[in-house]
Amino acid sequence: MGLEDKPDLVAGLITTRDASERPADEGEGLLAHVAEVTVIIENRGDAIAGETTTRFWITGGDIDQELRVIQTPPLLPGAEVEVTALWNMRGLDGQYDIIVTADAFSQLEEMRKDNNAAVAHVVVRGTRVELV
């Protein structure tokens, strides 16, 4: 298998959405202190990327822990998928880094591995989370 016929998963832009930003119909069942953390995973390679694992990690304050691990579906070359984790921010005022890693457990042989992670710096104030 040559370099040109491998998948290449990329963790792209990380976004957050707290209760104040959720339309009422989408927030049904979600508590006010729960935020959504979403990343776009894209296959920039030239081969199909099989099912993999995307890991969300939170660090800052007294926290350095896995938030969630999500099975990510197979992706054709050029395809992308949004992957979302829920974050319980109750009592977590302060600054945090959210690190999201595509193919977190190196399940695929990829063109590159240095583009699998993305980081977002956020500030939590009560039930609000803001990118900084």
Language model segments and positions:
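Extracellular/luminal regions of secreted and cell-surface proteins that mediate adhesion/ECM remodeling
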Residues: M1-V132
